[in-house]
A protein has these predicted regions:
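Short beta-strand segments
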Residues: 7, 37-38, 116-118
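The conserved acidic donor/metal-binding loop of glycosyltransferases
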Residues: 90-94
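N-proximal low-complexity "stem/linker" segments adjacent to membrane-targeting elements
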Residues: 1-24
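Glycine-rich, basic loop-to-helix element that forms the pyrophosphate-binding segment
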Residues: 64-81
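Conserved donor NDP-sugar-binding/catalytic core segment of glycosyltransferases
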Residues: 98-121
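Acidic donor-binding segment of Leloir-type glycosyltransferases
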Residues: 22-63
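Short aromatic/hydrophobic "clamp" motif used to bind/position activated sugar donors
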Residues: 86
Length: 121
């Protein structure tokens, strides 16, 4: 099962947090993960993300032309995602390495339409 994880970001001030979030997604134990990065209306951030992640096959980068907010950016990420399942993570969060594996297990073991859980520090 392919899982697309949508990660939205918008400012260089938070870029180091964004990088940690992105790297935690890319380090998942599940082997079919697509990271979908949506940059919300910042050319500087878009250029940096494309430079740092644009050549990766497991990363899809989308840059909004203008700042549309988190909800619209997440919706855009879900629209461009190619996975069977779409998950969301904030740009200041770090995913446990087995997060996607547990998500996939929930979908494969039960007849569910959605799954969620708590985030811990």
């Amino acid at each position: 099962m392919r899982v697309s994880v949508v990660l939205c970001t918008y400012t260089l001030d938070m870029y180091h947090h964004f990088e940690e979030a992105a790297e935690s997604v890319l380090a998942q134990t599940h082997d079919d993960v697509e990271l979908v990065v949506v940059v919300d209306g910042s050319d500087d951030v878009c250029e940096r993300v494309e430079r740092d992640y644009g050549d990766r096959r497991d990363v899809l980068v989308h840059c909004n032309e203008e700042n549309v907010g988190l909800l619209a950016s997440r919706n855009t990420g879900a629209e461009v995602a190619t996975g069977d399942v779409v998950a969301f993570i904030d740009d200041d969060a770090i995913a446990d390495e087995r997060w996607v594996e547990a998500l996939v297990a929930a979908y494969e073991e039960r007849d569910v339409l959605a799954a969620g859980g708590r985030m811990t520090a």
